[in-house]
Amino acid sequence: VYIPNGQSVGSEKFEYKMKWLKGLHHYLEVLTQTNEKIIILGDFNIAPQEQDVHDPEVWKGKVLCSDEERAWLKKIEQLGFIDSFRLFDQEEGLFSWWDYRAAAYRRKMGMRIDLILISKALKENCIRSYIDEAPRALERPSDHTPVLIELGL
């Protein structure tokens, strides 16, 4: 998935993001009725928890970290999805996105907004879920770095 960024809380683009999340939730509600094993991954443009943000106080209430966005993510999880990354003990400060404009990568000022959500039926098959930061250190990288999962099926 690519969930729209939302620009800023209260903006038209943010309202569009909220409608988009409502539509995704409805789609997943229907999908879970006939499918037991589902993986949803991509740029969610939502940092799930405070620990997924380099400085939670700076970002509190702002786009990517707002209560509204996190509430929609929680509603999706309540359909039976698990954040695969949080199934494992992870060191602090692991992020998947850094803003170019602030030289954020060099300053370790990132967020984890790229997620892999798995249905509970896949939990026992999840061997590893991690972030590969190596591509972000290349000469002309994306502002995101890959998030990966290993499943034993």
List PLM regions with ranges:
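Active-site regions of metal-assisted phosphoester/phosphodiester hydrolases
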Residues: 1-153
